[in-house]
């Protein structure tokens, strides 16, 4: 079944995702930054050789985009990440264009987004969070759920949605 395959390829035995107690999804989760800092500094969290925690604090929000070649809109997940997100999820790799710049209103689009939504091609602009965001790259994640997301700088996305809190810690 396609849904089971997607869920299996999105997760990993090598990391865990922390959400708020009773949150049924990343979107419903709210973690304050202080709690996230406590989590990433726990001794169970793997570390880079320089001692930094191997973790990614993330904001996950839903936006609406116009469908490509059809009428109507549909929900798309936007994920604000830290640099470690790419080491924690090695299946996510840029296949076209380039990585977004940290501190910029730029995003990379999952391969599944580019064929289904308007404005999701390299060089195009997507409006969300009260601003225009430039799509600078396309990524593939081996058919995982991430292929249906837009990714950008955690701080830029949190700022655009006026989010002082986080959604998850991976």
Model-derived features: positions:
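Mechanotransmission and gating elements of multispan inner-membrane complexes involved in transport
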Residues: 10, 46-49, 55, 66-73, ...
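Active-site/binding-pocket entry motifs
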Residues: 24, 61-63, 83-86, 141
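Short aromatic/hydrophobic contact patches that present stacked aromatics
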Residues: 17, 106, 168-170
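Hydrophobic, regular-secondary-structure patches
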Residues: 1-77, 96-98, 103
